[in-house]
């Protein structure tokens, strides 16, 4: 594996947020519990992803877990209380749902780099990422029904779109675990590489993506998500279209005419069929 010098962009307690040549890397840093997340972990990830979204130097975002044994094992059951996962303020939350939605609407590709276990809510995080590079030691699966939990959102509905309804039911009803090759065969990941090559492969995919039009990638992500995200997905794609329209001379003519208190001259712009 190439020894890269990742730059720390911000210090957190339960995650790492780093940068390397146009790539932001968000790492869940709780290896002692297989990178299970708490409300604080999720809040820190939301903050880091939001910063990556706004950072013009970031083209692609990588989500991973600290160490080689786990990507993420879902919510920390020791923090689970009445009505949700209890944070330092003693308020029960399921703020991971906000994180899932954020990953979907960020107009930049998000790649899951999976080493070891991606189970429970960890597998759902894998599911909502745009692409997945899996190490050959990766293990995937859902555990909710074993521990009195479930994900009736992306973790089931979108999972069924990816692997098929019969397979998704098998994953949830039986709570089995699947190795990296099985995950590849069902379409849950994009590629499988040796553990010591997984970061090299992930960076290579990022570099290839970064050669392409960011506006085209933004619209492609929004279009593919709109199919499963309903009106919220359409709103995202429409918002992206509005931002693009604001950069045109036609939109600027309307703005300038209003500011100059005159009628706009839209006749100068083409009306393509």
Swiss-Prot record:
The keyword Lyase applies. Residues 254-265 have a biased composition (Basic and acidic residues). Pfam families: ECH_1. It comes from the Bacteria. Its EC number is 4.1.3.36. Residues 254-273 are annotated as: Disordered. Pathway: Quinol/quinone metabolism; 1,4-dihydroxy-2-naphthoate biosynthesis; 1,4-dihydroxy-2-naphthoate from chorismate: step 6/7; Quinol/quinone metabolism; menaquinone biosynthesis. Keywords: Lyase, Menaquinone biosynthesis. GO terms for cellular component: cytosol. The record marks 85, 246 as: Important for catalysis. Its cofactor is hydrogencarbonate. GO terms for molecular function: 1,4-dihydroxy-2-naphthoyl-CoA synthase activity. It catalyses: 2-succinylbenzoyl-CoA + H(+) = 1,4-dihydroxy-2-naphthoyl-CoA + H2O. It is an enzyme of class 4 (lyase). InterPro entries: ClpP/crotonase-like_dom_sf, DHNA-CoA_synthase_MenB, Enoyl-CoA_hydra/iso, Enoyl-CoA_hydra_C. PANTHER family: 1,4-DIHYDROXY-2-NAPHTHOYL-COA SYNTHASE, PEROXISOMAL (PTHR43113:SF1), NUCLEOSIDE-DIPHOSPHATE-SUGAR EPIMERASE (PTHR43113). This is 1,4-dihydroxy-2-naphthoyl-CoA synthase. It comes from Staphylococcus aureus (strain N315). The gene is menB.
């Amino acid at each position: 594996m190439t020894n890269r010098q990742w730059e720390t962009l911000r210090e957190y307690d339960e995650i790492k947020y780093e940068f390397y040549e146009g790539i932001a890397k968000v790492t869940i840093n709780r290896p002692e519990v297989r990178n299970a997340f708490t409300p604080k972990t999720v809040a820190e990830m939301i903050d880091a992803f939001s910063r990556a979204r706004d950072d013009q130097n970031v083209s692609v975002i990588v989500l991973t877990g600290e160490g080689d044994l786990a990507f993420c094992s879902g919510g920390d059951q020791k923090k689970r209380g009445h009505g949700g996962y209890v944070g330092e303020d003693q308020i029960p939350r399921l703020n991971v749902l906000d994180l899932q939605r954020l990953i979907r609407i960020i107009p930049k590709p998000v790649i899951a780099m999976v080493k070891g276990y991606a189970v429970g809510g960890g597998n759902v995080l894998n599911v909502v990422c745009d692409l997945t590079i899996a190490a050959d030691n990766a293990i995937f699966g859902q555990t909710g029904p074993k521990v009195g939990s479930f994900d009736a959102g992306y973790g089931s509905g979108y999972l069924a779109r990816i692997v098929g309804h019969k397979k998704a039911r098998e994953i949830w009803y039986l709570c089995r675990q699947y190795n990296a090759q099985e995950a590849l065969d069902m379409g849950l990941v994009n590629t499988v590489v040796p553990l010591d090559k997984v970061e090299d492969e992930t960076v290579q995919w990022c570099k290839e993506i970064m050669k392409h039009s960011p506006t085209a990638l933004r619209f492609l992500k929004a279009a593919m998500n709109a199919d499963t995200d309903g009106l919220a997905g359409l709103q995202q794609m429409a918002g992206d279209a509005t931002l693009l329209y604001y950069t045109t001379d036609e939109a600027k003519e309307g703005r300038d005419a209003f500011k100059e208190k005159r009628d706009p001259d839209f006749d100068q712009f083409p009306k393509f069929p």
